[in-house]
């Protein structure tokens, strides 16, 4: 055997070097194949299943990434100071309103409020005309406590309103109502004696009409700071049927405070502008930071814990970012909350006008105080990891009329004005409305 081995070694050494390399490689490959034991699938084989017990923190580590523990129920809304104006803006509990504007579709409108895409598809199936919404039309809808759509109302025109109610089969049934009344313009005027709400009601405005006035003027006027003796004139178009008021629409408002006049005139697109056709809304930033950061947890009002099955809504968006990143106010407004609050950690809330509120949570340091006025882009805090948090991030929320919406898709205010033929038509309309807004 030794002689055979020496003969093989001698023959191997006498080979040219390239041949020796090739032969060696083939030898190694042959040995590898010889010791390899492949897994053979047998169709009828009984699988072996092992159950592994995990601790709760280990379970969480296997779940999709989230910046806040998903196995804990979210606390109730952090307290935001309320007043009687908020009651007028909020309207009926569970009812939300929206005026259709440029680029809107039924899907884009309802998606930002977290309404299920399946419901939107069912609505479109119930009435194909819902796919052709027009600028200035109004939608309103009712949700259950779990965020499920129960009813949608579409004001097609002053004369026609369509209602879509959920059926037992989880579809929607459409009914149409035609209004037969006569529309009449009414001027209601008065002087502020105490609160604006009480003064407006004394002048003959309904709660819904007071709400419409507050929304139209929200970017120009802080109604809480009106003084005794300030004057207002409101032009309403009201539908009368058999001597009763059926519905109304705000056409124009004039408010005089400390000797200065403020106007809001309705245009055909359903929005309000000043006498010159300039938009009243103050524009918002889309993101609360100077640069964009990775989203670690999305908006989901019906987020379900995959382990417990419990609904734990996530009412905002989480941005993963280094601690100490400057956090910016997305729009002009007033700081209404700046404090430390259990789950939210260091927390800031800003009110923009009367309809919009933004919230910023898990901060490391707060740079503003309650009552402070801020401008779009102002630094209000530094991001952190305080409160109930699994890592450094900013939790950011947008609320419209006390309803949380998706910050990434919500239709935010923009600074804009009318141009071209739209502006010419508006100026002609304003020329008729403004003279009617008299105080005498």
Swiss-Prot record:
* Transmembrane region(s): 21-40
Which biological process, per GO, is one annotated for this protein?
peptidoglycan metabolic process
Q: Gene3D superfamilies per the record?
A: 3.10.450.350, Glucose Permease (Domain IIA)
Q: Which GO terms describe its cellular component?
A: plasma membrane
Q: What does this protein do?
A: A murein DD-endopeptidase with specificity for D-Ala-meso-diaminopimelic acid (mDAP) cross-links. Its role is probably to cleave D-Ala-mDAP cross-links to allow insertion of new glycans and thus cell wall expansion. Functionally redundant with MepM and MepH. Partially suppresses an mepS disruption mutant.
The record places the following residue ranges in the Periplasmic compartment, namely 41-440
UniProt topology in membrane:
Single-pass membrane protein
* Pathway(s) of this molecule: Cell wall biogenesis; cell wall polysaccharide biosynthesis
* Domain LysM: residue ranges: 96-141
Q: Which gene encodes it?
A: mepM
Phenotypic consequence of gene deletion: Cells are shorter in a single mutant, while triple envC-nlpD-mepM disruptions have defects in septation and cell separation and form long filaments (15-fold longer) and further yet by the quadruple disruption mutant (envC-nlpD-mepM-ygeR, over 21-fold longer). Quadruple mutants are less sensitive to ampicillin lysis. A triple mepS-mepH-mepM mutant is inviable, whereas a double mepS-mepM will grow on a nutrient-poor medium but not on a rich medium, suggesting the 3 endopeptidases are functionally redundant in vivo.
Looking at the keywords, is Cell wall biogenesis/degradation present?
Answer: yes
User: Has the keyword Zinc been applied to this entry?
Assistant: yes
Alphabetically ordered keywords of this record: Cell inner membrane, Cell membrane, Cell wall biogenesis/degradation, Hydrolase, Membrane, Metal-binding, Metalloprotease, Protease, Transmembrane, Transmembrane helix, Zinc
- EC number(s) stated in the UniProt entry for this protein: 3.4.24.-
Q: Where is the protein situated, by its record's location annotation? A: Cell inner membrane
The GO terms describing molecular function are: endopeptidase activity; metal ion binding; metalloendopeptidase activity
Co-factor(s): Zn(2+); Ca(2+)
In terms of PANTHER family, this protein maps to: MUREIN DD-ENDOPEPTIDASE MEPM, PEPTIDASE-RELATED
Give the species this sequence originates from.
Escherichia coli (strain K12)
What this protein is called in its record is: Murein DD-endopeptidase MepM
Similarity section: Belongs to the peptidase M23B family.
Note describing how the cofactor binds: Zinc, although calcium also allows some activity.
Kindly list the positions annotated as binding Zn(2+): 314
Please give the residue ranges for the topological domain Cytoplasmic: 1-20
């Amino acid at each position: 055997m030794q002689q055979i081995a020496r003969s093989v070694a001698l023959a191997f050494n006498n080979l040219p070097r390239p041949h020796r390399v090739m032969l060696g490689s083939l030898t190694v490959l042959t040995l590898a194949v010889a010791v390899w034991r492949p897994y053979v699938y047998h169709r009828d084989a009984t699988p072996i299943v092992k159950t592994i017990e995990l601790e709760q923190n280990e379970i969480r580590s296997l779940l999709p990434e989230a910046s806040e523990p998903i196995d804990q129920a979210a606390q109730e809304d952090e307290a935001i100071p309320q007043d009687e104006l908020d009651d007028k803006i909020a309207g009926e509990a569970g009812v939300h309103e929206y005026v259709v504007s440029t680029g809107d579709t039924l899907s884009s409108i309802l998606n930002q409020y977290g309404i299920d895409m399946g419901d939107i598809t069912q609505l479109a199936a119930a009435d194909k005309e819902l796919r052709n919404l027009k600028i200035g039309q109004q939608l309103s809808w009712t949700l259950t406590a779990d965020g499920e759509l129960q009813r949608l109302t579409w004001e097609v025109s002053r004369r026609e309103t369509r209602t879509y109610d959920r059926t037992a089969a989880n579809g929607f049934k459409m009914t149409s109502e035609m209004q037969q009344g006569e529309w009449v313009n009414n001027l209601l005027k008065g002087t502020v004696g105490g609160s604006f709400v009480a003064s407006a009601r004394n002048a003959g405005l309904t709660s819904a009409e007071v709400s419409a006035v507050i929304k139209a003027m929200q970017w120009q006027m802080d109604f809480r700071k009106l003084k005794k003796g300030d004057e207002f004139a409101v032009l309403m178009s009201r539908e009368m049927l058999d001597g009763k008021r059926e519905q109304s629409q705000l056409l124009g408002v004039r408010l005089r405070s400390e000797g200065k006049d403020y106007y809001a005139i309705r245009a055909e697109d359903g929005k309000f502008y000043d006498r010159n056709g300039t938009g009243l809304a103050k524009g918002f930033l889309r993101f609360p930071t100077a640069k964009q950061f990775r989203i670690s947890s999305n908006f989901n009002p019906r987020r379900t814990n995959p382990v417990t099955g419990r609904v734990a809504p996530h009412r905002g968006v989480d941005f993963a970012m280094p601690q100490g990143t400057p956090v910016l106010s997305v729009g002009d407004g007033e700081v209404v909350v700046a404090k430390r609050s259990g789950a939210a950690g260091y927390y800031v809330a800003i009110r923009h006008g009367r309809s919009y509120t933004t919230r910023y949570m898990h901060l490391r340091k707060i740079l503003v105080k309650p009552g402070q006025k801020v401008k779009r882009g102002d630094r209000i805090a530094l991001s952190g990891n305080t409160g109930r948090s699994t890592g450094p991030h900013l939790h950011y929320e947008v609320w419209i009329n006390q309803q949380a919406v998706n910050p990434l898709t919500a239709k935010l205010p923009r600074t804009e004005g009318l141009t071209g033929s739209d502006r010419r038509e508006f100026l002609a309309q304003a020329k008729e409305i403004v003279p009617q807004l008299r105080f005498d």
